[in-house]
């Protein structure tokens, strides 16, 4: 495991889970609610009956609750952070489907599960694979090799165009944000490379400057296309929420209790939801 991988693992191992009680007074509670709602809707859009699910970058298992009432047969959770996996294992107790956990880096290690997955997902984690072309290809091949024909790969990921546009508005150092979040470009951010363009992302109560990378979704889409996988869904989070809040009003009212504040909205606008299908 190289230095950058160690730093990511250490970073997420140190993040403390927020209890339901503390969540109510969280400064980014609106962001958490919207993100959870959109991840739930994305899963429901593409999950199949009796599904095998592979979760790349599963973290502490926060999305296990979103699969609880879905037609899942077997779940495989993969994460680089060992302490996070311990909590995920604890959260899996009592679920109706089988669960397996792998302590591995999906952007450098070869991931092999016992049976092909109907759904592979990577929620807010796949952008770490864009540290290099090699790591992106390894991550993409882990998706491709573990996905059955007709299976779907879903991911929620930062939008490079939004990040670049906001950074360009600050001619001094390219950083941007507000009281709740901040993006600080690293020297590599300003290169013309397709990979390894880094920035530090700070998010209140969640992220404290872990190095992240601009995504190159055009490259990923072409790479998948060469393997017989096609993009079938792509939308920014703001458009997604504006559609899904009306598509399932009951779920929206149950999961999203608050209106996003003016400081929370720019955080939501940083992300996209995307899906690919293996033909």
Annotate each predicted stretch with a short phrase:
Residues 62, 66-108:
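Class I SAM-dependent methyltransferase SAM/SAH-binding core
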Residues 111-120:
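A short acidic, Gly/Pro-enriched loop at the edge of an enzyme's catalytic core
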């Amino acid at each position: 495991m190289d230095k950058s991988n160690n730093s990511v693992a250490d970073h997420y191992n140190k993040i403390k889970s927020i209890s339901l009680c503390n969540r109510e007074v969280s400064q980014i509670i609106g962001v958490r609610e919207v993100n959870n709602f959109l991840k739930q809707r994305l899963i429901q859009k593409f999950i199949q009956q009796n599904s095998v699910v592979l979760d790349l970058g599963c973290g502490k298992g926060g999305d296990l609750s979103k699969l609880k009432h879905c037609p899942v047969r077997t779940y495989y959770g993969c994460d680089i952070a060992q302490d996070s996996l311990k909590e995920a294992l604890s959260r899996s107790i009592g679920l109706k489907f089988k669960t397996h956990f792998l302590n591995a880096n999906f952007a450098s290690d070869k991931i092999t599960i016992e049976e092909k997955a109907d759904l592979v997902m990577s929620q807010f984690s796949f952008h770490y694979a864009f540290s290099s072309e090699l790591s992106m290809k390894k991550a993409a091949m882990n998706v491709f090799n573990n996905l059955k024909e007709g299976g779907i790969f879903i991911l929620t990921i930062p939008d490079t165009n939004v990040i670049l546009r906001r950074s360009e508005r600050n001619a001094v150092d390219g950083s941007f944000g507000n009281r709740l979040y901040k993006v600080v470009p690293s020297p590599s951010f300003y290169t013309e490379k397709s990979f390894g363009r880094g920035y530090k992302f700070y998010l209140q109560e969640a992220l404290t400057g872990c190095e992240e990378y601009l995504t190159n979704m055009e490259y990923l889409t072409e790479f998948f296309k060469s393997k017989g996988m096609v993009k079938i869904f792509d939308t920014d989070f703001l458009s997604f929420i504006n559609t899904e809040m009306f598509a399932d009003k009951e779920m929206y009212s149950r999961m999203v209790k608050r209106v996003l504040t003016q400081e929370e909205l720019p955080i939501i606008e940083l992300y996209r939801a995307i899906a690919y299908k293996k033909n």
